[in-house]
C-alpha cells in the first residue's frame, strides 16, 4: 500500500513539474502598450505592417512596437565627431544626418536580395534602388546617407556597390535601435538633434519624407 501511494505521489509531482514547465514556455503576446493579447490578435495587427513584432521583456514574450519614433538627442556634435572618426567622412553640421542601419543577417534582409550577387541584373537592381534613394536625399537636403552596421553578416551582396561602416562604440544601436528590427532601419537627425527613426524594412519615400522634415 505504501509503495502504491509513493508511486502515486511521484507521478503527481512529475505531472505538476511538466505542467509548470509547459506554462512557463508558452509564448505570451503583448500590444504596443504592453497589454496582453491573443496570438491571433498579435498576428492580425502585425499583418497590417503598421507595427513590428519584437522580443518582449522575457524570453517567451513577443511584443508589438510602432514603426516610427520621434525624439531628440542631447549632443549632435558629439555624434558628428564620432561618425566622422569612424567613416573618415566630413559631415555638415547644418544638414541632417541620414543613417541606414543594418542589424545583421535575418530572413527579411536575406530574402529579396539574397542571391543578387549571382548575376549582373540583380547587382544592377541593388545599385539602382540605392542610387534612387541617394538621389532623392540629395534633392531634399543636399547630403548623402551613411551606411552603418551592427553585424556584417548579410552585407556581401553590397560588395562594390555600397560602403558600410561598423557602428562606433555601438552608439547608433544604443541611441536609436535597441532591438533587432527585421531587415534594415533608418534614422534622420536634424541639425538641432531632433530625429525620426523608422524600424524595419522601408521604402525610399519614407526616408525622403523624414529627411525633408528634419531639414527644416
Which residues does each PLM region occupy?
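Short active-site neighborhood of thiol/selenol oxidoreductases, capturing the structured segment around
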Residues: 86-126
